[in-house]
Amino acid sequence: ITLSGWDTNISNSENLIIRYMRFRPGAANVHTGGDSMDALWGRDNKTFMIDHCSFSWNTDETVSTYRGQDGTVQWCIVSESLTVSGHSKGRHGYGGIFGGDNVLFQNNLIANHTSRNPRIGGGCMGDPTKDGGSTATLQLSNNVLYNWGYNTCYGGGYAYTNFINNFLKPGQGTREQVRYQVIDMGEATKPGGFYVNGNYMDGNAEITADNAKGSKMSGVTEGANKTVVSETPYTAEGFDSATVTSAADCYEPVLAQAGATYPYRDAID
């Protein structure tokens, strides 16, 4: 099953499972359906799983799911956002916004996007800046990031994020100044925290051995809105028991198994 032509919105859903589907909106309706068409997006979701799906050819983000709780996005291909699609902001091909409390993003292939590879979007259900809002805890592990343009993973306000054991491989579209950037941590006006460890940077053994040498800090390090760099992983029931391999060992399985593989991959994947 392939959904095309329009974005797919799963916001405010609960007890949701999506498996073995393809989402490729394209740009044919960019001027009639709104120019911010994600292949799939949702916020304020509760108890959800997105597994073995393929997402591409969007005019805004490819996959965005944030400000929810108790979810997993795994074994998906998130690829080929449309950089020049007719979006009102011009060049606009992004990977996605990942977030939510007690949410795991694991074993995904995130490839060929200029930025938001992904962006970490913080907070739980509702607005984290208002009464009842809170800081989310999430994990990105064993993902393969390939051929980012001018930014890798960044953001992270109102979130405590484990960014661990991911495989990063720059490509022909990667700008030289971010070629070996593992992550850009924090937002200056929002509190948050990161645990970054075990990530493999293809072509740079020094950064593979010490991820701090490939990490940038865009948050502030003092005051109420500081971004904390943790020496130990953050914990949450949803991912504490997840099986996480080394970054080097996740590369081949993700390439072989990610995406809508049942009954077989299409020609795009």
Where are the model-predicted features located?
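Short, solvent-exposed loop/turn segments at the edges of secondary structure
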Residues: 13, 91, 113, 161-163, ...
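WD40 beta-propeller repeat blades
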Residues: 67-72, 77-81, 87-92, 97-113, ...
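Intrinsically disordered, low-complexity Ser/Thr- and acidic-rich flexible linkers and loops
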Residues: 128-130
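Right-handed parallel beta-helix
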Residues: 1-102
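Extracellular beta-rich repeat passengers
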Residues: 119, 124, 134-269
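Extracellular beta-strand scaffolds
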Residues: 1-3, 24-25, 56, 61, ...
